[in-house]
Amino acid sequence: MLEIKNLQKVYGIPGVSAKPALNGVDLSVGQGELVGLFGENGAGKTTLLKCVLGLLGYAGTITLDGEPVTRANIARLSFATCEHSFFPHLTPAGHRDFYREPFPRWREKRFQALMDFFRLPMNKAPGSFSTGQKNQFEVILALSQGADYILMDEPFAGNDVFNREDFYKVLLGILEPTETVVLSTHLLEEVEHFVGRAVLLRAGAVVGDTSVLELEERGMDLMAFVKSAYGYEPDRVSRALDRLTEEGEEETP
């Protein structure tokens, strides 16, 4: 169980230029869950994932099966980030050899199968890959480390819709019952049939947490749930257009 209690993160200097990013987040994620983490830009999604990984300092507690996340259990977590964590000049074959030692549960068969699926070359430096290929390689590494909890932050930015759709199908087929995925993305419709649970962040706080099954029973899809939790105004577009096209609008000389 990944447990987050009263998680708080403030950027800047308190009392001078402080900017709250997380405000008392409470969240529990059990092994085997597929969780979608949603929210507008600046909601705190990336900050939350980085706090879990120990990449940022924070107030509150984060534990794995009751133990704090330390060097002793960090291998139970992996991270795929659109900021990229791989070595740009080390080939995929070199990454495989490098990762085998610190990650004793390295999944060689999965690594090779995903490299073949995305048609990525084993002996070409990933720094020369396209943006989409770099993100693919980042995801492959995260899925091959043998981690129990796989955290993903906008993993398929720069990838076409066909690659994304096919990959989610492959992912559902290869994940073991004990593997957990926490996926941060804006692509709600694409992941609706992949995730089993939706967690919504807004201004650094959890404003919604439900299972996709519960939404279906309520006759709602994921987009409707997000709009409801966010208080979305359906007439905002028409109001903006009315203002922009109203007669007598002053023209700039």
What are these regions (language model features)?
Residues 81-137:
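ABC-family P-loop ATPase nucleotide-binding domains
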Residues 60-73:
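Conserved ABC transporter NBD signature motif
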Residues 213-253:
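ABC ATPase nucleotide-binding domains
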Residues 38-40:
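The feature captures the beta-strand-to-loop junction immediately N-terminal to the Walker
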